Amino acid sequence: MQEYELKYGCNPNQKPARIFMKEGELPIKVLNGRAGYINFLDAFNGWQLVRELKKATGIPAATSFKHVSPAGAAVGQPLSDVEKKIYWVDDMDIEFTPLANAYIRARGADRMSSFGDFISLSDVCDKSTALVIKREVSDGVIAPGYTDEALEILKAKKKGNYCVIEIDPSYEPAPIERKDVFGITFEQGRNELHIDDDFFSNIVTENKELTEQAKIDLAISMITLKYTQSNSVCYVKGGQAIGIGAGQQSRIHCTRLAGSKADNWWLRQSPQVLGLQFVDGIRRADRDNTIDLYIGEDYMDVLAEGEWQKFFKVKPDVFTAEEKRAWLDKNTDVALGSDAFFPFGDNIERAHKSGVKYVAQPGGSVRDDHVIETCNKYGMVMSFTGIRLFHH
């Protein structure tokens, strides 16, 4: 197949639309459903991300994309009982394979943003991963292959219309890439980033102790940022992105946005949230939205008289600002990556509030000394990679 016709482009008024290869065949097969323009943008960016994560870590990887940026990305490290509970898989009687764990983590970190995602998997989709995907609201999935059982499960999703794409894992694009804007063609060399043992070796802080898990987490942050709309910042812990701030014009706003997402991820593991008693039959999306409101500033939207009864069997106590701060202070060993340099130490001050201990960024600001000084104040380890990772 050299060409795939699309119903429309980014918007319904943008017709005709297609994807095609000028030379050779497309490296994909659409096994089920029909993919759209944005679906393919998500799929091809996501596939590159998980392929590189697998290469860098040796662990199966998954990502959850929305509007051409990842809402989550992870490798398949084991899940704790608490993580299974906050990701709504504690009731599943399945084998938690590394690939299934990777998607559970990628989807679970920011469930509000991942609603209606496009999934990318680094490895052949197995039955367990397909069963996890089956119960989530999602537009489609791309993977290098599917077991017969997995494909049967996925084909039944969305009344038989779920988009399933198989990509040739041996496909390599040309070293030069092009795109047209306003009738003008842009051309550039592909952004080739290779993470190895020396990538984070230029440590500029007093604390130079970088653990093996920290190296994995920093690698996840760098590769995730490579495929996130800039400016972007990514918090990672335990093999998964826990907060991604994408597409902001200000670096500090990226750090705050991603930090607030990381905080929400950690607050969901608090006794206050784990103890919530939801009404029977509440939908998964409503449960996610209720928790998001409960731990946020608009908590009275779900705690006011006449409202809480819609969501809870028992009215919860208010999760006070003091209680939330006390719980957030228990979060430690978080890794933070930035697609460009931090211009001021305020980014590090904000990162500290979300438990950051490890930082990777290109360096090169005229205020590098201030940023390093702020890291030293909190005993952080910071690496200057020398590589900017803008993505547009």
Describe each PLM feature range.
Residues 1-196, 214-232:
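Active-site loops and adjacent core secondary-structure elements that bind or stabilize anionic groups
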Residues 22-34, 109-115, 189-208, 285-307, ...:
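Gly-rich Lys/Arg/Thr-decorated short loops/hinges at beta-loop-alpha junctions or inter-strand turns
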Residues 52, 227, 264-268, 353, ...:
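Conserved helix-loop functional segments at active or binding sites
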Residues 56-64, 164-167, 230-237, 267-278, ...:
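Flexible, glycine/charged-enriched surface loops at secondary-structure junctions
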Residues 69, 125, 237-240, 248, ...:
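Active-site-proximal loop/turn and secondary-structure-junction residues that shape catalytic pockets
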Residues 71, 117, 121-122, 135-165, ...:
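C-terminal binding/interaction regions
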Residues 71-112, 242-341:
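Glycine- and Gly-Pro-enriched alpha-helical subdomains that act as flexible
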Residues 202-244:
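Internal active-site segments that recognize and position negatively charged phosphoryl groups
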